[in-house]
């Protein structure tokens, strides 16, 4: 059977108090609406339509990579009106449509799939996603007749018996497309708010003796975000889910409450993560690594057996058995080899560092190719920028760079060379050479006495 989905993402979200449309606020590094789109995709629903309104162009910009279509709700007149705006998307289609909100990022793909499967297997015209909660105050109650849904009653309209019902409407649905389109034509905005409500479709279907069912899920999954506090709550739940998955897969997380891992991160078993680490994007971390406190790793590949201390690694690759930090900064497009030492207060920018090379402290390497088994003394600077352009430096294997050396790019240092401490290198250093480029020391005896500087 054909399946499609509609995601409601047109509202501004005034209570979140932001210039940014509500659905574009991030939970664990990903926009809420993209969490929902990805849940649809992972539930094997490829045809997804996003209802846009406030900040429409920005929402399109942030979701376009997910290959979705869009329907515009220029004026926000309720959930029923939002779905009516997707009429062009639905017309000509057969099968079922899942309808979810773009501000409920905790929904799981398996829940979406189960809802759709339940709807199809029970041959329903509509199937609601519901939850059972201890305190349902403020929520619409699900009134059942056996297994089927009889009606949804808003809290303020509940009678003495209905007020005791703990099953609530989550605001997420699966509909038979033909039944939905027919019912949408009958929707009325004859209410205090002057809006069209999707819940009224259920009443219309029941009047036509159509079958309406419901599937209960964990209330946590259905949580929507209307404020910064609710966003923080949702992110906390999501972070706990992510961390629990890694724990179950053999990763040690010393303090899960203070470890921040985004959903697409992959971590190998027997890796140990201390508190304060932030691991973002599509980072892949190998096995047997140790991430000591307070590092940030973004969109990077970390090999096996790597140790990282209080450092920042962005869009780069770190080889096996390498150590980084403390307080190192590995900038984008850097490729650090195996068994390398990147020490304290070292900055690497868009450079390749060969295996077994040591850059132990207080060094800047930018736009460089560094060979294997090199050693950089403290205070080395690759001077890659002339004020207008960046230039490249090449350093061969087995080179020793003395302390306080400046390598003025573009320049090449051949294999097996030594550069004396304090040198400023502006020309090629031949293989097997010692390069000394500093002023000759001159001692002027009696100078202090004569100048009376004591």
UniProtKB/Swiss-Prot annotation:
A Pfam family the protein falls into: Hexapep
Cofactor: record remark: Binds 1 Mg(2+) ion per subunit.
InterPro entries: Bifunctional_GlmU, GlmU-like, GlmU_C_LbH, Hexapep, NTP_transferase_dom, Nucleotide-diphossugar_trans, Trimer_LpxA-like_sf
Subcellular localization, as worded in the UniProt entry: Cytoplasm
Alphabetized GO MF terms: glucosamine-1-phosphate N-acetyltransferase activity; magnesium ion binding; UDP-N-acetylglucosamine diphosphorylase activity
CDD domains xrefs: GT2_GlmU_N_bac, LbH_GlmU_C
Source taxon at top rank: Bacteria
Keywords of this entry: Acyltransferase, Cell shape, Cell wall biogenesis/degradation, Cytoplasm, Magnesium, Metal-binding, Multifunctional enzyme, Nucleotidyltransferase, Peptidoglycan synthesis, Repeat, Transferase
EC number(s) reported in the record: 2.7.7.23, 2.3.1.157
Pathway participation: Nucleotide-sugar biosynthesis; UDP-N-acetyl-alpha-D-glucosamine biosynthesis; N-acetyl-alpha-D-glucosamine 1-phosphate from alpha-D-glucosamine 6-phosphate (route II): step 2/2; Nucleotide-sugar biosynthesis; UDP-N-acetyl-alpha-D-glucosamine biosynthesis; UDP-N-acetyl-alpha-D-glucosamine from N-acetyl-alpha-D-glucosamine 1-phosphate: step 1/1; Bacterial outer membrane biogenesis; LPS lipid A biosynthesis
Main location: cytoplasm
GO-annotated cellular components: cytoplasm; membrane
Active site: 361
Binding site for Mg(2+): 103, 226
Residue span of region N-acetyltransferase: 250-454
GO BP annotations listed: cell morphogenesis; cell wall organization; lipid A biosynthetic process; peptidoglycan biosynthetic process; regulation of cell shape; UDP-N-acetylglucosamine biosynthetic process
Binding-site list for UDP-N-acetyl-alpha-D-glucosamine: 8-11, 22, 73, 78-79, 140, 154, 169, 226, 331, 349, 364, 375
Reactions listed under catalytic activity: alpha-D-glucosamine 1-phosphate + acetyl-CoA = N-acetyl-alpha-D-glucosamine 1-phosphate + CoA + H(+); N-acetyl-alpha-D-glucosamine 1-phosphate + UTP + H(+) = UDP-N-acetyl-alpha-D-glucosamine + diphosphate
Quaternary structure and interacting proteins, as annotated: Homotrimer.
Record's protein name: Bifunctional protein GlmU
Organism (species): Clostridium perfringens (strain ATCC 13124 / DSM 756 / JCM 1290 / NCIMB 6125 / NCTC 8237 / Type A)
The organism's taxonomic lineage, starting at the top: Bacteria, Bacillati, Bacillota, Clostridia, Eubacteriales
Gene: glmU
